[in-house]
Amino acid sequence: MLDQRLVRDNPETIAQQLGRRGKAVDLTKLQLIAQQQRDLEQQRSGLQAEGNRIGKEVGQRIKSGADPKGDEVAELRQQGNAIKQKVAVLEEEEKQLSSELKQQLLGFPNLPSEACPDGRSEDDNVEVRRWGTPRVDDGLYEHWQIAERLQLFDTERSVRIAQSRFVTLMGQGARLERALINFMLDLHTSKGYREVLPPVLVNSASLTGSGQLPKFAEESFRCAEDDLWLTPTAEVPVTSLHRDEIIPADQLPLRYAAYSPCFRREAGSYGRDTRGLIRLHQFNKVELYWFVHPDHSDEAHQRITADAEAVLQALELPYRVLDLCTADLGFSARRTYDLEVWLPGAGAYREISSCSVCGDFQARRSSIRTKEGKATKLVHTLNGSGLAVGRTMAALLENGQQSDGSVLLPKALVPYVGRERLQPE
């Protein structure tokens, strides 16, 4: 959430920065509410100062010999009580305005970092680096074709069980999925991450804190009777691990690695990636999440990105890193590096991780602070996929496919799967 003071005092700057995202914004209503709130604050402060003056005067007059029950003191006390009533009315009006302002602010995305490249679409994303040599053999199959031959998952029966865009992993496919989850968690915890297995159902406050609500309500699955939602990413519950908390500065950074099934409606993606594991309503993901001191968030962004890259490197999967332009940034992000893995069957790079620094945007929405001495300030948060498991499986199938129909697995994964290659059963 944006800082109310910035909106009130520097609306031109806010409008300019949000404009870098490629959308014109109208802050008129926000400014009006913020100014009304400021006027009420000044009125209340003036009345409270007058009330304090009257209270002191009552004490002084009694000390000077005035009758505590006399008309002179009674009149002053009556004035003081009248002021208290006015203050109470103003406080209620302030409370209502504050709530209205917050609801308005919840709909605005984060301000992009100054370092974030400007752009109008994903075509303006900037490639930072590549790793590995992309395989470009002729006659390679896409992952869903390989999976059909190896009987790794069953989509037809999944439609019967649920609907389209669900998949039931079978046999070697289920084993490979489980192996990837364990491999990713082991790799991250070996680097000091604390493993988390959060609830899959989260409340509205959690989704609001991380930035999914109110903007993305239609893209999430909801259990309306209980005010619970199926989490779209472990970023949501992990953000709320420390909601409404003050984290001592000497405990930062906090680094978590959280496995969770994720659920998304994928609204607006009709007709895209209809086969295979790329775009599903339910998928597994290992999420990396950092709570850091504000002074260290840029450094942490490089580190969390490197930790996500380490998974791809260990699995010998070629990839590239993109610095997303302002128009392609996610709602809560100040700056994002996308990792795109090479899929030789599809002949394209596809997103497999987004590593974002969110500044104090989520911390303000979730009231997560740190304390140094007597001063408190909002922490900064970062998140990144480490990795999306289904897309990782797709990349392994396409990059490891052999002419005999088998799939050769990377050495790092063999102990987890218990075999060197996947073959028709």
Swiss-Prot record:
Cellular compartments per GO CC: cytoplasm
Enzyme class: ligase
Assigned EC number: 6.1.1.11
Highest taxon of source: Bacteria
BP GO terms, sorted: selenocysteine biosynthetic process; seryl-tRNA aminoacylation
InterPro entries cross-referenced by the UniProt entry: aa-tRNA-synt_IIb, aa-tRNA-synth_II, aa-tRNA-synth_II/BPL/LPL, Ser-tRNA-ligase_type_1, Ser-tRNA-synth_1_N, SerRS_1_N_sf, SerRS_core, tRNA-bd_arm
Reactions it catalyzes: tRNA(Ser) + L-serine + ATP = L-seryl-tRNA(Ser) + AMP + diphosphate + H(+); tRNA(Sec) + L-serine + ATP = L-seryl-tRNA(Sec) + AMP + diphosphate + H(+)
GO molecular function: ATP binding; serine-tRNA ligase activity
Pfam family name, one: Seryl_tRNA_N
Binding-site residues, L-serine: T233, A234, E235, E287, S385
Compartments, as annotated in UniProt: Cytoplasm
UniProt pathway: Aminoacyl-tRNA biosynthesis; selenocysteinyl-tRNA(Sec) biosynthesis; L-seryl-tRNA(Sec) from L-serine and tRNA(Sec): step 1/1
Positions contributing to ATP binding: R264, R265, E266, E351, I352, S353, S354
PANTHER family registered for this protein in UniProt: SERINE--TRNA LIGASE (PTHR43697:SF1), SERYL-TRNA SYNTHETASE (PTHR43697)
Purpose of the protein: Catalyzes the attachment of serine to tRNA(Ser). Is also able to aminoacylate tRNA(Sec) with serine, to form the misacylated tRNA L-seryl-tRNA(Sec), which will be further converted into selenocysteinyl-tRNA(Sec).
Stated family: Belongs to the class-II aminoacyl-tRNA synthetase family. Type-1 seryl-tRNA synthetase subfamily.
Subunit record text: Homodimer. The tRNA molecule binds across the dimer.
Entry comment, domain topic: Consists of two distinct domains, a catalytic core and a N-terminal extension that is involved in tRNA binding.
Name recorded for this polypeptide: Serine--tRNA ligase
Source organism of the structure: Synechococcus sp. (strain CC9605)
Lineage of the species this protein comes from: Bacteria, Bacillati, Cyanobacteriota, Cyanophyceae, Synechococcales
